[in-house]
Amino acid sequence: MPERDITEKYLESYNDVFADIVNVLLFNGRRRVLPDDLRDTKARTLYKADGKLREQERDVSKVWAPGGTVISLIGFENQTRMDRDMPLRVLGYEGADYRNQLSAQGGLYPVVTLVLYFGEEPWTAPRSLYERVHVPEELRPFVSDHGINVFEISFLTDEQTEWFTSDFRIVADYFVQMRRNGDYVPSRRGIEHVDGVLKLLSALTRDNRFEEAQNQFREEESVTMLSVLDKVEARGIQLGRTEGIQLGRTEGIQLGRTETARNLLRMGLEPAKVAEAASLTLEEVDALRGQAG
């Protein structure tokens, strides 16, 4: 399994984070699902295609079973980009889950899938089977239209973001701010699952300096996104200096500063701080923002 796939799932696999996401997105912040009511279930299922046995794997899935009575199986699928085939993929996952229930010869329960979309553009890809597959009008009475539940994390309201009580609030706030402003103002809110948060941000933004920053904190040290970005900023400055020294020319130093500024802008640092950290003028930083946009 690719490392990025694993790191995407790490934070959401914690019961407190999983329950929090479900409570906010499905129940408008009401504490319906408790962490102790969740139990892990296998996310990988097998199916046969072209005469060969193949496997498919959900990002994260858990069984909701308060008091030992199963209410539902709930699964997450993370998306940083729109996927036109998402209704078909979700239908495949849920069909496999129901098939497993039949094989287990136990009680049957519903399957719910939440597609967590972190893109900066509204989801315009198909949200149902009918939107993806052409079904003639005369066949529609006989073909069920399977819809999917897409939650646009970057478009959550401030109220919805504040409903989160787990570390996922930090993740959601990051994407909401970056989508609205192109900048990120970090909070002083403490991070409980530091490794999980930084790995998820690294995977979703494709910037592994989030994950690298974790190694710079001492064990038991209180960590916030403010302190994380301080480490990231310092790392960016050092990388810029190193690149400039290795090139050994004025052009090399300028290139190092420019690359540092680009990296810090991608992290969401305010332009004024980027200019100061990279030894550039605010006009130069604004020009780099224009190139990125």
Which ranges hold each PLM region?
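Elongated, amphipathic alpha-helical interaction scaffolds
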Residues: M1-G293
